Amino acid sequence: MASITLTPSEKDIQAFLEHYQTSLAPSKNPYIRYFLKLPQATVSIYTSGKILLQGEGAEKYASFFGYQAVEQTSGQNLPLIGTDEVGNGSYFGGLAVVAAFVTPDQHDFLRKLGVGDSKTLTDQKIRQIAPILKEKIQHQALLLSPSKYNEVIGDRYNAVSVKVALHNQAIYLLLQKGVQPEKIVIDAFTSAKNYDKYLAQEANRFSNSISLEEKAEGKYLAVAVSSVIARDLFLENLENLGRELGYQLPSGAGTASDKVASQILQAYGMQGLNFCAKLHFKNTEKAKNA
């Protein structure tokens, strides 16, 4: 029988109770605030704030609190380095890449914390758990600022090769700290052939083999950790850049970015956009023609 223990916020507990209020049932345990009998699972909410979910459907109901079960795929139960990047699709902000080293004995802690793919977590949740991950998990974080990004793109790198360089460097630096992974997984952003081609121009190399896997953040906790930390780093950078210019910079590359880009261009010229945005995006031309 599956058993999951979580410590969600009181707000999330109340939202869960409201959603499943018809399943509330009495309990003789004085330490249980609320007890719910749900299809294929029972949920005990303790006075301490902890929640115990038991039964075949435990994972389903735990997902309400951000819990994400990680498939027991090949290599998941090995000491593992996983990498991911955030910011590649956003006009404003830098490009954050993180490599994290996770061992099997850390899996329960990470699952209880609610670690999953950063794409499924709210920014608020990411900002909440990222500091804990940074403290507890060995990792290497890199941030390429927009101005530095603009400097290297079109010169030595393109949008793909620069990510190869950053992923490679993050792994290299993490290995230099003495971690000993039995597997290294990169959340695939290009083919293995392309990765190897661009890797050939990098000076820092290592002998460990790597595996590029699509949707790796949903398969490996090490990649999920990197995804969360990278998202947090990107959001922090976005806030700092916007604060310096006096604008709230949106994530992404949609119409909201077009509008702010036009305003920054009028206020600061191209120097302002070079400071906070990736200039090769189409948003730049739209701002010029606005």
From Swiss-Prot:
Record's cofactor remark: Manganese or magnesium. Binds 1 divalent metal ion per monomer in the absence of substrate. May bind a second metal ion after substrate binding.
Catalytic activity entry: Endonucleolytic cleavage to 5'-phosphomonoester
Record: residues binding a divalent metal cation: 84-85, 187
PROSITE patterns with a match to the protein in the record: RNASE_H_2 (PS51975)
Limits of the RNase H type-2 domain: 78-290
Keywords associated with the record: Cytoplasm, Endonuclease, Hydrolase, Magnesium, Metal-binding, Nuclease
CDD domains attached to this UniProt entry: RNase_HII_bacteria_HIII_like (cd06590), RNAse_HIII_N (cd14796)
Stated name of the protein: Ribonuclease HIII
Originating organism: Streptococcus pneumoniae (strain P1031)
Gene label: rnhC
